[in-house]
């Protein structure tokens, strides 16, 4: 069984990753991964994409057909266009309803497995010391503070350990995001400098002669 210290740290790490990446982005990634599995929902999504391609092809042909010069062809394409549009709207509504249910399920699972466990562990292991402080190294008020609310005096409580993990991980995440943003900005500025036109040597010489 993994140590409670490690369990708490991993949970806090997952929470920080979710906050940094974003719940919507995670839902989108899981949704795409789920659609790659051969399920009825994946089949439904594939049918919708295929129907959308058919609709766009008919719409393109309809726009290219004159209603005055080729009325019969235009009327046939119009009926086909309206039929495909109706079928596409139905399939799109069905997929969107499935996506809404999927997002609710993923959100509930993520909340229970992160925030729910995050709240449950201090209630269940509130009296259990995470580790003990060296005896006599810290004054009484420090020992009382780190053992708050129910851990034995002189030990570090699970609440304090959670707060310490959250603070450290937040600093690390902010530092990583800042470094990545700096690298990205440096690359973009480098590309912009490369795109700037450099004056030709002949043009410079011509300007010099004119000045003379």
Swiss-Prot record:
Compartment(s) where it occurs, according to its Swiss-Prot or TrEMBL record: Endoplasmic reticulum membrane
Covalent S-S links between cysteines: none
Pfam family, one: CHD5
Stored InterPro entries: Get1, Get1_fungi, Helix_hairpin_bin_sf
Protein name as catalogued: Protein GET1
Topological region Cytoplasmic: 25-110, 173-212
UniProt GO cellular component terms: endoplasmic reticulum membrane; GET complex
All ranges on the Lumenal side of the membrane: 1-4, 132-155
HAMAP family to which the protein is assigned, alphabetical: Get1 (MF_03113)
Record bears the keyword Metal-binding: no
Entry keyword set: Coiled coil, Endoplasmic reticulum, Membrane, Transmembrane, Transmembrane helix, Transport
Family from the record: Belongs to the WRB/GET1 family.
Oligomeric and partner information: Interacts with GET3.
GO biological process: tail-anchored membrane protein insertion into ER membrane
Membrane disposition: Multi-pass membrane protein
TM region positions: 5-24, 111-131, 156-172
Region (Disordered): 188-212
Biological role: Required for the post-translational delivery of tail-anchored (TA) proteins to the endoplasmic reticulum. Acts as a membrane receptor for soluble GET3, which recognizes and selectively binds the transmembrane domain of TA proteins in the cytosol.
Coiled coil: 72-100
One Gene Ontology molecular-function label: protein-membrane adaptor activity
């Amino acid at each position: 069984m993994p140590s409670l210290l490690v369990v708490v740290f991993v949970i806090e790490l997952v929470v920080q990753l979710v906050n940094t990446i974003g719940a919507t982005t995670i839902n989108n990634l899981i949704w795409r991964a789920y659609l790659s599995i051969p399920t009825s929902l994946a089949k439904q999504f594939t049918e919708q994409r295929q129907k959308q391609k058919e609709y766009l092809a008919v719409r393109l042909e309809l726009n290219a057909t004159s209603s005055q010069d080729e009325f019969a062809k235009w009327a046939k394409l119009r009926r086909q266009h309206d039929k495909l549009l109706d079928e596409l709207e139905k399939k799109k509504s069905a997929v969107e309803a499935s996506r809404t249910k999927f997002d609710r399920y993923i959100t509930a699972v993520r909340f229970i497995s992160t925030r729910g466990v995050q709240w449950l562990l201090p209630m269940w292991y509130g009296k259990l010391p995470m580790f003990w402080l060296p005896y006599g190294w810290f004054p009484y008020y420090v020992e009382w503070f780190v053992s708050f609310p129910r851990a034995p005096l002189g030990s570090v409580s699970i609440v304090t350990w959670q707060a310490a993990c959250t603070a450290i991980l937040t600093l690390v995440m902010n530092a990583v995001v800042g470094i990545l943003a700096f690298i990205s900005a440096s690359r973009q500025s480098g590309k912009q400098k490369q795109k700037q036109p450099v004056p030709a040597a002949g043009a410079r010489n011509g300007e010099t002669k004119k000045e003379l």
